[in-house]
Amino acid sequence: MKLTEVIEGKARLVIPDPSEFSREGKFDPAWSPVFYNPRMVFNRDVSVLAVSVISPPSVLDAMSATGVRGIRYVKESGVKGEVLFNDKNPVSVELISKNLELNGITGKVLRSDANSLMHQVKVGYTDLDPFGSPAPYLFSAISSLRRKGVLGVTATDLSALEGKSRTSSKRKYGVQGSRLSYSKEAGLRVLLGKIVKEASVQEKGIRPLMGFYHDYYYRLFVKMEDGAKRADRSLESLGTLYECDRCGYSFMSSDECERKCPVCGGELKYYGPAWIGEFNDLEFLKEMKNRLTEFSYLSNSVKISELLEYLERENRFGPYYRVDVLASRLKVNMPPMNSLLGCLGDAVRTHFDPRGFKSFREFSEILECVKGSSATYETSGR
């Protein structure tokens, strides 16, 4: 197997040469004997910053592949304690050892099934970055965490989480209902809801530190809080997401609601169970922002700063509305987002969708602003 060297952050890595596994001029990381995805660099850059704030005493990189995450946590996040690198692929295990030596760091390299290993260890931070759904690994990942431990998890199975595939949604996440127009946020809330349920079985509650959507995946950092009472409190933050199929009115509720829109009387679509609380901790985001200057060498430092600003602004609001969906329901042209936000006043864009916004204004006022902004746009000649 031919290897090539890449630089990511402060890490030097040898990875399988993509040219050896290309097909008709195209390359998919899944075709390589060891998985390395350059499209996940932003995910890893954010994670390096987040782990520097978490400052765990020990780390498990449960599905290490090349070892890039664990290596970067040592070299960039300042992790001083033991780092466990695990992968069941023997080729990966060999490559991880090479990369540890290349970077001059020590770590324990294991070849084990991730679920089996996570039931045997106790660490301060477990990183779960599976190929596809994290659902089969969540219970054991939570059990691997010591008191007040933190779980970092990536999910790429958007079809199941967002409700595009209702059978997958039900099978993997126990979700009932239909896909909503704010599906990107719904998916993140469903993933958090699944984590709550898996943690509660182990008498643990959760505190979300950071959650976001980017490109084609979700990324979450969730702190565990031991105790049955904390587990019960987290379960109280589960509920159902709703959206009127006629007028577009959306809301979340922990109580079971009539399937009739309180605004127009239309049929309510629903999706859940899902987390209905906040999914970002403002103090955690603030500390990440404060530390970002130390990570100015990252190619994504500006993008990370922008993401943190988005998350901070939108955290206090409920689900977002899509301006194109509301305009379609009103049978008007879609207005410019800036005009709409100016009309609403207390409203923000969302990182989930460039067409999305969040507002505390009454729904009737939101609709009036959509109509008014559209009319102004039309009369101004666009």
Curated annotation (Swiss-Prot):
UniProt: S-adenosyl-L-methionine binding residues: 44, 69, 87, 113-114
PROSITE patterns: SAM_MT_TRM1
This enzyme's EC code(s): 2.1.1.216
Superkingdom, taxonomy of origin: Archaea
One Gene Ontology term of the molecular function aspect: tRNA binding
Keyword Cell inner membrane: no
Domain Trm1 methyltransferase: 4-370
Keyword vocabulary terms for this entry: Metal-binding, Methyltransferase, RNA-binding, S-adenosyl-L-methionine, Transferase, tRNA processing, tRNA-binding, Zinc
A single GO BP: tRNA N2-guanine methylation
Reaction(s) the record says it catalyses: guanosine(26) in tRNA + 2 S-adenosyl-L-methionine = N(2)-dimethylguanosine(26) in tRNA + 2 S-adenosyl-L-homocysteine + 2 H(+)
One matching Pfam family: TRM
List of residues binding Zn(2+): 244, 247, 261, 264
Protein family according to the UniProt entry: Belongs to the class I-like SAM-binding methyltransferase superfamily. Trm1 family.
Reported function: Dimethylates a single guanine residue at position 26 of a number of tRNAs using S-adenosyl-L-methionine as donor of the methyl groups.
Record-given protein name: tRNA (guanine(26)-N(2))-dimethyltransferase
Origin species: Metallosphaera sedula (strain ATCC 51363 / DSM 5348 / JCM 9185 / NBRC 15509 / TH2)
